[in-house]
Amino acid sequence: MKLVQFWHDSAPALGLQTPQGIVDVQAEAARRGVSAPADMAQAIALGDEGLSQLAPLAEGARCFTQAPPAPVVTQTGRILCIGLNYRRHAKECGLPLPPAPVPFCKFSNALAAHGEAVKLMPDYKEYDYEAELVAVMGRPARDVSVDEALDYVYGYTCGDDLSTRDLQFARGGQWLLSKTFDGFAPIGPCLV
């Protein structure tokens, strides 16, 4: 199942991507007189129960939308990232491969929808992007064993990690400011 979000009355609404188009989950659920999550946060919170409410809505759906896409996930507690997570990229950046993962964060203002234009600032000239696999957590996790880790993942989507390298390296290699501008974390188009 491919879950998406789209803008409805300036708020994100949940959709199902099907070969026929994007099903408006709330409109389709209302047409059928059934309950369904209103947005991605509700779907994630409901876990398997939410997925079982959503699956039948794709069959014989009549309520489709052409609304613009929203970021697949909009209500995030944290956006945790791992820097220099593969050898070739570390080499491209001229940096040594770290002995342990290098964590950094992005803020929710950095989220953007798949295909959304990202506004670049004229003060910076060295923009960079990295394609990423985004794991969306389905429930809180702390001190989880390696064997259990994937039990906490709700789904996956694609993402881009945008950076202004001139800002990043001008300030001693910090990562936060250069990676958290509005729209610097486009994700989507769907969550699987």
How would you label these PLM feature ranges?
Residues 76-192:
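Glycine-enriched loop-and-adjacent helix/strand subsegments that border the catalytic/binding cleft
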Residues 1-101:
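N-terminal non-catalytic cap/leader segment that marks the start of a structured domain
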